[in-house]
Amino acid sequence: GVDVESGTGKTGGLEISIRGMPASYTLILIDGVRQGGSSDVTPNGFSAMNTGFMPPLAAIERIEVIRGPMSTLYGSDAMGGVVNIITRKNADKWLSSVNAGLNLQESNKWGNSSQFNFWSSGPLVDDSVSLQVRGSTQQRQGSSVTSLSDTAATRIPYPTESQNYNLGARLDWKASEQDVLWFDMDTTRQRYDNRDGQLGSLTGGYDRTLRYERNKISAGYDHTFTFGTWKSYLNWNETENKGRELVRNVLKRDKWGLAGQLRELKESNLILNSLLLTPLGESHLVTVGGEYQSSSMKDGVVLASTGETFRQKSWSVFAE
């Protein structure tokens, strides 16, 4: 099955797991494009940061879920399955939605939370150019509860005050009945309070404030043939986890003087994907295509020891 729940991670965010596998093995796509960064950027219980960029509900047309391994097509991070969120596009008139919510707890030991999101989409040039803008914010108060029972773990969901922001826009150009070009930008900012060491010890590698930042730019081209559809896109995204610090026990002796300095955790990915979708009979679909990825990651622990930046380039061709 598919589980969407707030786990016992340090941020209290939502995680999606499929068929009992950890959330790190569920790949999240929006309009077929990868969104989150590697779990190596969010180590030690911060993986839920990668799900803080979902579009507003009004922007979603449908959600496609593939349960089971899709590693051949998407890589090892799709061993559990794939969730593809399809957004609304090419509206023939302007549509807008604004939503606000407030969750009030009965006990003042639990933090209240509020949400606000908006979405608007419509034509700029009739039957040719359309624009979509979207955004959301979530504010959560801290919780003074540290344990649910005498035997429970000290860490629980919703442990600390946080502010999450997401803003994005998409431009579609229908050049002809068969050709569509699109451009999409998205930015996410998350902030978590750690003044009392709720997320990690202030003397053990954590700053007083932890932040997660993600920027994404995508451009694509879709062409419709009589026998199928050709889809291509170029996607660049950069994610950074700020607020971690270097500690002596992970540094070489001659690097102990760096203890207490900020630990850089930053990743960037460039992905070029192109595929052809064509029906086979009345109930089958054939997918043929290829993908190229260029990735780099910086970890302050490795940088302090060797100065090395991890880099990887890979390509693949596939048929399904």
What are these regions (language model features)?
Residues 109-141, 147-191, 213-220, 279-283:
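Transmembrane beta-barrel wall of Gram-negative outer-membrane proteins
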Residues 17, 33-67, 118:
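Short acidic/polar hinge/loop motifs at secondary-structure boundaries
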Residues 68, 86, 99-105, 134-138, ...:
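Outer-membrane beta-barrel pore domains and translocons
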Residues 1-37, 61-62:
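Extracytoplasmic beta-strand/coil segments of soluble accessory domains associated
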Residues 172-190, 210-320:
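Face-selective signature of the C-terminal outer-membrane beta-barrel domain
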Residues 13, 78-80, 101, 113-117, ...:
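Transmembrane beta-barrel architecture of outer-membrane proteins
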Residues 44-48, 65-66, 99-103, 149-155, ...:
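Extracytoplasmic loops and strand-loop junctions of Gram-negative outer membrane beta-barrel proteins
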Residues 43-46, 58-61, 72-84, 88-146, ...:
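Outer-membrane beta-barrel translocator/receptor signature
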